[in-house]
Amino acid sequence: MIEAVSKIVKISGPGLLFASTAIGVSHLIQSTRAGADFGLMIIGFVVLVSVLKYPFFEYGSRYANSTQTSIIDGYKKLGTPILALYLIITVCSMFFVTGAVGFVAAGFFENLFNLEFLGEWSIILLFISCVLILSIGKFNLLDNLIKIIVTILVVSTVLAFSLTVINGPIEPVKDFIPKELWTTTGIFFLLALMGWMPTAIDLSSWNSLWTLEKIKQSKYKPKLKETLLEFRISYLLTGILAIMFVTLGTFIFYGSGEELPNNNSQFAHSIITMYSSVMGNWSYIVIAASAFTVMFGTILAVFDGYSRALNRTVELLFRKNNTNQSKSSRKLYTVFLIILASGSLVTVLQFGDNLKELIDFATILSFVIAPVIAIFNYRLVTGKYLEKSHQPAVWLKILSISGILFLSGFAVYFILLKFIFTNQFSY
């Protein structure tokens, strides 16, 4: 028994880090908005996109365990132009993604400590904290923090969900008219929801980097099935929590006539009130602290993931010695942390106080570039780059092809809808 627990501790971490990046904005914000605006019908789309995206996230962990190199190294094997394209995709999206997550985290920070007067200084303080923690600390610190944070979120969400289901949905206001999903605005929101459900596919490279770092830190090389089991449990957790958040949004907001605010601090207050309304007013401060902790964990994971990915990509593209072990590698990691913080701050300031617009822009951007990364990952785990015994099963390959067709189809549909057929929606 003790040996089994010890093994679980040794392999747990990368999947939970993935869950942390997913739970922050896509669940706490987007899933709640989806339920509040469109009700339980949105759950079908949440489940569908989570299933179709699953293979491409799993392939990051699979490739790392099988080859003992990151999937970014795999992109280099596909050809230098492929790796360069990955770098371009990362640079084009990272400031919007990090800015969106940071903006939400700042809202919960302001709400918790009643610091709305700080304005942009709240996000500056958060970004500085992230850079300091990650540049001074090591993976072990991030790993342990995330385990605590995910536990807090799961417990509080399951409790709130259970109490909400017991109490039942609110009574719709008189003359309530449900929002139509199949309108231009509704479709754009659906694409935004699916873009980060459970998170952006280009973040799959982080799984492989975290898997390798966990092996290095724990000095334990798990079997492939152990690595995949840890990831699958974490992925399933993100799916279940997404359904819970949609349900919470539906039961508490749908039909109430209330609109979730666009200001990040006010939005945070609405989310926390959603919890406390079913758990009791006494829980407000507890939930506020838990929600901020979750968002802080998400922004830490995002900063770490992007900086690791950029670090490894630049090493492979521009350095002859790609050992990834040197002091210069650590310095480069810190440089990317600073660049990421600076660029993301500028992005947030450009969007002003428009929380929904920033999040929707970042999530739709992720959805449009998703098919490219999906194809890269599929080629790596089904071709000559991976041993036959470590390649995915036939059903997973079929699911992958279905996912690529789905993502590609919707990406093309978005481009046609946005730039050719209509000008009704703008950021």
Q: What does each model-identified segment do?
A:
Residues 1-27, 192, 218-229, 233:
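Membrane-interface "cap" regions at the ends of multi-pass membrane proteins
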Residues 15, 87, 112-136, 151-162, ...:
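Transmembrane alpha-helical segments of multi-pass small-molecule transport proteins
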Residues 54-64, 211, 236-269:
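Extracellular/periplasmic helix-exit of transmembrane alpha-helices
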Residues 2-4, 39, 66-93, 112-119, ...:
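Transmembrane-helix boundary/entry motifs in multi-pass membrane transporters
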Residues 66, 82-114, 295-315, 354-355, ...:
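Hydrophobic transmembrane alpha-helices that form the core helical bundles
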Residues 18, 45-76, 85-96:
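Juxtamembrane transmembrane-helix boundary signature
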Residues 134-164, 181, 362-370, 396, ...:
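Membrane-interface loop-to-helix entry segments
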Residues 151-180, 190-209, 373-386, 410-423:
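Hydrophobic alpha-helical segments and their helix-loop junctions in multi-pass secondary transporters
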